[in-house]
Regions:
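Arg/Lys-rich, alpha-helical DNA-contact motif
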Residues: 1-8, 14-18, 22-123
Length: 123
């Protein structure tokens, strides 16, 4: 989708999208005729960022999520790289399943740790 379509679908302004791009939170998947195009991951990130912005969170504050995701991806890569080096469909499928499960577990851990860290405010 185009930047205009992404803004319309996510509720972002063009300036907000530009800020998200500047901080490396939303990336174009490809460029066609010099125009950037965005994929469904960009739409999801843009929509979630728009939701955060409604609470006064600025794009620069969201960089921590990008940094954490990059670190987590690097860690997962280390874990599944031996499977991917085997170069067979079964190992590739096992690597994908491992990443999916680790992602699910990591999401649960983050949620539990955040709840624990904020417990005094939530009770």
């Amino acid at each position: 989708m185009t930047g205009e379509e992404l803004c319309r679908a996510s509720g972002l302004s063009a300036d907000e999208l530009a800020q998200l791009e500047r901080f490396g939170l939303v990336a174009t998947g490809r460029s066609v005729g010099g125009m950037p195009y965005y994929d469904e991951d960009a739409l999801l990130v843009a929509s979630l960022a728009a939701g955060c912005m409604k609470f006064g969170v600025e794009p620069r504050h969201l960089r921590m999520y990008r940094t954490a995701a990059e670190r987590e991806a690097g860690f997962f890569e280390q874990l599944v790289l031996p499977m991917l080096k085997q170069r067979n469909p079964e190992s590739r499928q096992q690597a994908l399943e491992t990443i999916e499960e680790l992602s699910r577990l990591g999401e649960g851990l983050r949620r539990a740790m955040l709840r624990s860290a904020l417990r005094g405010y939530l009770e």
